[in-house]
């Protein structure tokens, strides 16, 4: 399955540049501390087939699952939060114009990640990286 292109900044991003910045400072800090390239490498060829509808990039979806876990959100709540919160969109890698995954897509990605045994190792690796830099992220809490 081919991947969708997300994160290309457009006119709407210029209009919303300041929106959600204050609430997104923690997420921006987290984003700067994590080795996303290494995590993307661990995800490997997540969509081996090039047939069917394009899927969201695996790293983007992993970031969605991280936000969901940290904020204790259900799949429908995560979908709504991505629609509503610019800080979440920016952290995950979506521009203001990008379509975001619906709750079923989030669920399917999580199931595929679990089936490959990658869910716990990837979440633990993110937690380890943040903890090694003085941040402790738990459900609903950030401690530095």
Protein language model features and the residues they cover:
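Charged, often Cys/His-bearing segments associated with DNA-binding zinc-finger transcription factors
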Residues: 1-37
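Short, conserved catalytic/metal-binding motifs centered on acidic residues
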Residues: 25, 43, 64, 78-82, ...
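Secondary-structure capping and boundary motifs in well-ordered enzyme cores
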Residues: 35, 52-58, 98-102
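Short, Lys/Arg-enriched N-terminal segment that forms or immediately precedes the first helix
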Residues: 40-53
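Alpha-helical support elements that line or immediately flank enzyme active sites
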Residues: 60-72
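Short, solvent-exposed positions on alpha-helices
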Residues: 73-80, 121
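Short, basic interhelical loop/turn and adjoining N-cap
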Residues: 86-96
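Active-site- or DNA-interface-adjacent structural scaffold in DNA-acting proteins
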Residues: 94-144
